[in-house]
């Protein structure tokens, strides 16, 4: 099927090493489990069944791998400083990009990794930013007739996003990232998260691995992933993601949508049949199109692919060869 991990041939000439979840779990070695069941429950998103067993199977090995990349980056930084005779300068943050479809579990992965990586001695300060804050405000999207394209590449203020990442990788202190409200479904005016020289910055969003056409005139323009030191893609079959998205929408009708301030409050009081029809329409007309056109094509650019089965748990890991 197009859009599945089988697109990559698991042979000696594949750009990836492939591991089952059981094989991957062995790379944990003696990495201690530092999260409790209550912490995992707090960190996971609605309808995401991740538990301590999944953290043991997948995320401890992943945090160990990422920590070794961070330590290697720090060692290279020190060696380069000696080579350049630069003296005492601060290392810029190690940036991890996390991409994948809506409802696939990017946010849970990002939050779990943030907690685990912050407990490694090489990276005590870990921050997390999502691309949601870099969406254009709804007022702009309506004016440009882009509300039905929200989440597509053109709905983001790419200039602001690139300026943010450029400042982070330049080592600037107190870099501001705009904040987003999932309640109001809009960017919060004049509200920011301040990122102050962390050891690691996790940058999560559906299209963070997207490339772009070369501009006319040959002018060099960076892309978001140019600023990443490591990238992760969360993968699953279309049918699974479809079911997760619709189930999440229906469950939100009983929770967040009931808030009078919710952008989606109108869906809380309609019939279940009508709500299901709306969820299916949103999936078919917006999210599935974005997945096929803009998200899945970025998957081969990831350093690591975490592939989920129908139960929302990871069953295969693909790690790019060095």
From Swiss-Prot:
Residues where ATP binds: 100-107
Reaction catalysed by this enzyme: (R)-pantothenate + ATP = (R)-4'-phosphopantothenate + ADP + H(+)
Gene Ontology CC terms: cytoplasm
Keywords attached to this entry: ATP-binding, Coenzyme A biosynthesis, Cytoplasm, Kinase, Nucleotide-binding, Transferase
Listed InterPro entries: P-loop_NTPase, PanK, PRK/URK
UniProt main location, coarse: cytoplasm
Assigned EC number: 2.7.1.33
Subcellular location as annotated: Cytoplasm
Keyword Transmembrane: no
GO biological process assignments: coenzyme A biosynthetic process
A Pfam family matched in the record: PRK
Pathway assigned in UniProt: Cofactor biosynthesis; coenzyme A biosynthesis; CoA from (R)-pantothenate: step 1/5
The keyword Nucleotide-binding appears for this protein: yes
GO molecular function: ATP binding; pantothenate kinase activity
Chain segments annotated as coiled-coil in the UniProt record: none
Family of this protein: Belongs to the prokaryotic pantothenate kinase family.
PANTHER family for this protein: URIDINE KINASE (PTHR10285)
Protein known as: Pantothenate kinase
């Amino acid at each position: 099927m197009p859009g599945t991990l089988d697109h990559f041939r698991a042979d000696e000439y594949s750009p990836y090493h492939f591991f089952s979840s059981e094989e991957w779990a062995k790379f944990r070695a003696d990495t201690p489990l530092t999260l409790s069941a209550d912490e995992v429950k707090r960190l996971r998103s609605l309808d995401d069944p991740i538990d301590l067993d999944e953290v043991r199977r997948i995320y401890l090995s992943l945090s160990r791998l990422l920590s070794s990349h961070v330590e290697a980056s720090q060692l290279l930084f020190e060696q380069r400083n000696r080579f350049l005779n630069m003296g005492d300068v601060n290392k810029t943050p190690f940036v991890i990009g996390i991409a994948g479809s809506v409802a696939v579990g990017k946010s849970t992965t990002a939050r779990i990794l943030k907690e685990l990586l912050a407990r490694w001695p090489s990276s005590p300060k870990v921050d997390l930013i999502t691309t949601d804050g870099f969406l254009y405000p709804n007022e702009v999207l309506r004016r440009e007739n882009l509300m039905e394209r929200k989440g597509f590449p053109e709905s983001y203020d790419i200039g602001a996003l690139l300026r943010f990442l450029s400042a982070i990788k330049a080592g600037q202190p107190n870099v501001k990232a705009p904040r987003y409200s999932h309640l109001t479904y809009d960017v919060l005016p004049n509200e920011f998260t301040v990122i102050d020289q962390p050891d690691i910055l996790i940058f999560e969003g559906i299209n963070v691995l997207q490339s772009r056409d070369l501009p006319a005139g040959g002018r060099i323009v960076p892309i978001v992933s140019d600023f990443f030191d490591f990238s992760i893609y969360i993968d699953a079959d279309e049918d699974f993601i479809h079911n997760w998205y619709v189930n999440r929408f229906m469950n939100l009708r009983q929770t967040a949508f009931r808030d009078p301030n919710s952008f989606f409050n109108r869906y809380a009081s309609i019939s279940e049949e009508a709500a299901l029809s709306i969820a299916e329409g949103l999936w078919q007309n917006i999210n599935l199109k974005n997945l096929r056109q803009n998200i899945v094509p970025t998957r081969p650019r990831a350093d690591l692919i975490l592939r989920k089965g129908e139960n929302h748990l990871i069953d295969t890991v693909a790690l790019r060869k060095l």
